[in-house]
From Swiss-Prot:
Protein name: Proteasome subunit beta 2
Protease listed as a keyword: yes
Subunit annotation: The 20S proteasome core is composed of 14 alpha and 14 beta subunits that assemble into four stacked heptameric rings, resulting in a barrel-shaped structure. The two inner rings, each composed of seven catalytic beta subunits, are sandwiched by two outer rings, each composed of seven alpha subunits. The catalytic chamber with the active sites is on the inside of the barrel. Has a gated structure, the ends of the cylinder being occluded by the N-termini of the alpha-subunits. Is capped at one or both ends by the proteasome regulatory ATPase, PAN.
Gene3D superfamilies: Glutamine Phosphoribosylpyrophosphate, subunit 1, domain 1
């Protein structure tokens, strides 16, 4: 959100829907593909889930350039950490790294809302806002379609869902926003991260709209 000059009101800068959900043995991230500039559909196949490592990924909402730069910095930092320390960086440490960058730029902020999900000793999910605030979550949704998506997740969430059921829940949550939110659309991408795997799924709009 940004201050709208001359009105004293807040307005949404960008539109999207991203979700993150933690299950017993894995974490699921999902996002739509539509990129907008105001009410104009700027791109129909935008990748909003960025792979950081084989055990970590980040969803993005906000300004594309800011999100891409932060993802590149994080990927480079985690790679350097692994070379120096001969072990993986924890998801919490990666979230704190992003938090430091965002907080240090709070007077000239990066316009982003990030979800960082991955697996270290267990599946983890962090919600990071543009001022650097970090919260660990079991499930969360961001973007203009988040009010619709979070309702679907809260209604059907269980930590013990199978992977197939978990992917279906994430897809259904974003699909609900596609139906209701002008700024969300054009398909859904889903990533599942577990102890020894990183899996990607893509769903086309025509198939998503069949989802109840």
């Amino acid at each position: 959100m940004l201050h709208h000059p001359g009105t004293g009101q807040l307005r949404a800068l960008k539109g999207t829907t991203t979700v993150g959900i933690v299950f017993r043995d894995f974490v699921v991230l999902a996002a739509d593909r539509r990129a907008t500039a105001g009410y104009f559909v700027a791109h129909k196949r935008t990748k909003k889930i960025i792979k950081i490592t084989d055990y970590m990924a980040m969803t993005t909402a906000g300004l594309v350039a800011d999100a891409q730069m932060l993802a590149e910095w994080l990927a480079n930092h985690t790679h350097y950490y692994e070379i120096v320390n001969k072990r993986r960086m924890s998801i919490h440490a990666a979230a704190q790294y992003l938090s430091i960058i965002l907080h240090s730029a709070k007077f000239y902020p990066y316009i982003v809302q990030l979800l960082l999900g991955g697996y270290d000793t267990q599946p983890r999910l962090y919600n990071i806002d543009w001022f650097g605030s970090v919260t660990e979550e079991k499930y969360v949704a961001t973007g203009s379609g988040s009010p619709t998506a979070i309702g679907v997740i809260e209604d059907q969430y269980s930590p013990n869902l199978s992977m197939e059921e978990a992917v279906e829940l994430a897809k259904r949550a974003v699909a609900s926003s596609i139906r209701r939110d002008t700024f969300t659309g054009n398909g859904v991408d889903v990533v599942v991260i577990g102890k020894d795997f990183y899996r990607e799924y893509s769903f086309e709009l025509k198939d998503i709209l069949k989802t109840k």
